[in-house]
Amino acid sequence: MSYLRYYNMLDDFSAGAGVLDKDLFTEEQQQSFMPKDGGMMQNDYGGIMNDYLGIFKNNDVRTLLGLILFVLALYSPPLISILMIFISSFLLPLTSLVITYCLVTQMYRGGNGNTVGMSIVCIVAAVIIMAINVFTNSQIFNIISYIILFILFFAFVMNIERQDYKRSINVPIPEQYTCNKPYTAGNKIDVDIPTFNSLNTDDY
């Protein structure tokens, strides 16, 4: 006689018939190991397409726009760069933008003592704000600190504008447009100029 003739394996699982998936686990169990909804994009368009469409779900577009504005601010006139950094601060942290802008500007522009000093002040202020934000999450502090940091950054950019203006005034004149020949004042005509004493009136 076959073993299956007197033993039905489905009898041991009769209790599972009609039980829904949501009844098998508690809410805590589902949160611990069940897949989260919205964690990954459905593979409806293929793997490569999902990589491109995923930027709309992970704030990558926001970061990309902020970086584009920041790069344009680096190569724009100082006054326009203030506006671009201000817009970028809504997309990226202002502290990171200020630190990077000050470092890059000093690397390829250089500057005098005032510009270097203001860049150091802006960087130190941004680092302090970042450090305090680690221990506190006060929105009032963030607003006040960002206003102070933006004022310092504005003063730094205005120093750069003033420095560029002085450089434009003190542009050296090319040698081909300058006169390098020696010049001495005096009579340039190599002839004798008659005077009343040199006139001979005896002949008349």
Curated annotation (Swiss-Prot):
Domain of life per record: Viruses
Record field: transmembrane: 67-87, 140-160
Location of the protein in the cell: Virion membrane
GO molecular-function terms, A-Z: ATP binding; DNA binding; helicase activity; hydrolase activity
Membrane topology (UniProt): Multi-pass membrane protein
Keywords: ATP-binding, Disulfide bond, DNA-binding, Helicase, Hydrolase, Late protein, Membrane, Nucleotide-binding, Phosphoprotein, Transcription, Transcription regulation, Transcription termination, Transmembrane, Transmembrane helix, Viral envelope protein, Virion
Virion surface side of membrane: 1-66, 161-204
InterPro entries attached to this UniProt entry: Poxvirus_OPG144
Primary location: virion
Assembly mode: Homodimer; disulfide-linked. Interacts (via N-terminus) with OPG125 scaffold; this interaction helps OPG125 to associate with membranes. Interacts with OPG140. Interacts with OPG154; this interaction allows OPG154 to be anchored in the mature virion (MV) membrane. Part of a complex composed of OPG144, OPG153 and OPG154.
Protein name: Virion membrane protein OPG144 precursor
Species whose genome carries this gene: Monkeypox virus
